[in-house]
């Protein structure tokens, strides 16, 4: 199964088996960088077997319509994963909603790549997955993430104390959302 979304500098694609070693490399390279923003890692997370299974599960979840996971790669280095964008907990019916998550390699921060990736990913899930709303939550101390979401048009919905177990403790989060102004009511029937 293939899904390729292109932007000016990036390729966004569903996880695929040939890139499983690159995904493992991304997470090993960025373990310390991502730890403050990540939930506990499952057993085997640092193994190729885990990432091969992750590919299979991601493709099944995509086919079921419950998750869209996208691996980020630069067009100039298409075999290296530099980040990921995920739309999970997709709910259809009268909700038509997903939860956004994202991460980027520490050496690629500050170059506008995540903003570029999120713009394309959001455009895809709004138009092709026919979603009405995307929720995104971030820790208050992650100021960069808050600024990124605001630039993308996300609005603050509220504050959630002890919301997620992240970096070894229950952490407060700021809840935000983005509404698809182009959503059409007939999508409720077809989604």
Annotate each PLM feature.
Residues 33-56:
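Conserved GNAT-fold acetyl-CoA-binding loop/helix
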């Amino acid at each position: 199964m293939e899904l390729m979304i292109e932007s000016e500098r990036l390729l966004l694609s569903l996880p695929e088996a040939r890139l499983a070693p690159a995904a493992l490399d991304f997470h090993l390279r960025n373990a310390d960088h991502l730890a403050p923003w990540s939930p506990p890692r499952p057993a085997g997370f640092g193994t190729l077997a885990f990432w091969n299974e992750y590919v299979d599960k991601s493709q099944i979840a995509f086919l079921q319509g419950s998750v869209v996971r996208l691996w980020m790669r630069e067009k100039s280095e298409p075999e290296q994963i530099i980040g990921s964008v995920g739309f999970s907990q997709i709910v259809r019916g009268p909700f038509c909603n997903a939860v956004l998550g994202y991460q980027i390699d520490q050496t690629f921060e500050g170059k506008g790549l995540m903003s570029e990736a999120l713009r394309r990913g959001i455009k895809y899930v709004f138009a092709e997955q026919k979603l009405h709303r995307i929720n995104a939550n971030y820790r208050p101390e992650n100021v960069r993430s808050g600024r990124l979401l605001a630039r993308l048009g996300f609005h603050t919905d509220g504050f959630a104390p002890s919301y997620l177990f992240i970096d070894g403790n229950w952490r407060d989060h700021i809840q935000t959302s983005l509404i698809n102004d182009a959503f059409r009511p007939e999508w409720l029937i077809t989604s």
